[in-house]
């Protein structure tokens, strides 16, 4: 199972979790066009509130796990293919269960990741695929650093 792949294999330098993160990055990048098209000029008070909550919690150097999950799920809800939503949720669950075992995230990483959420949503709302991809890269940078 994905969870066991992320948790076990102690001698593999977290290879299983890196594999999962790489698939999440690939999926997020593959969904750039549908996400930016679905959200272009779209108002959503729920996502606005989630982004504000994420930034507020991160500024206190606290984890924003619930808000993070809701953000990623809400971002994909307008897409026609709900399998994307289910895959993202499965990968998100594995990654949030296993990342604390790495001693991550560091406080400064939480702030950077919170900012990346705002950048992802801002780019999606602007319909800016290039900025969205850059924000996805920023979103995963702290996690990838913790895995190397």
List each language-model region with its residue ranges:
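Acidic, Gly/Pro-rich loop/turn segments at junctions of secondary structure
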Residues: 12-14, 59, 79
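C-terminal all-alpha effector/ligand-binding and dimerization domain
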Residues: 48-56, 70, 89-148
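Short loop-to-helix capping motifs
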Residues: 80-82, 127-128
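Secondary-structure edge/capping motif, primarily at the C-terminal ends of alpha-helices
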Residues: 34-38, 54-61, 124
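Short linear motifs at protein or domain termini
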Residues: 1-33, 37, 148
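Short, cationic motifs built from Arg/Lys/His that form the positively charged side of catalytic pockets
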Residues: 24, 28, 38-39, 72, ...
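Short basic (Lys/Arg) and small-residue
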Residues: 75
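Amphipathic alpha-helix face/heptad-repeat signature
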Residues: 16, 20-23, 43, 50, ...
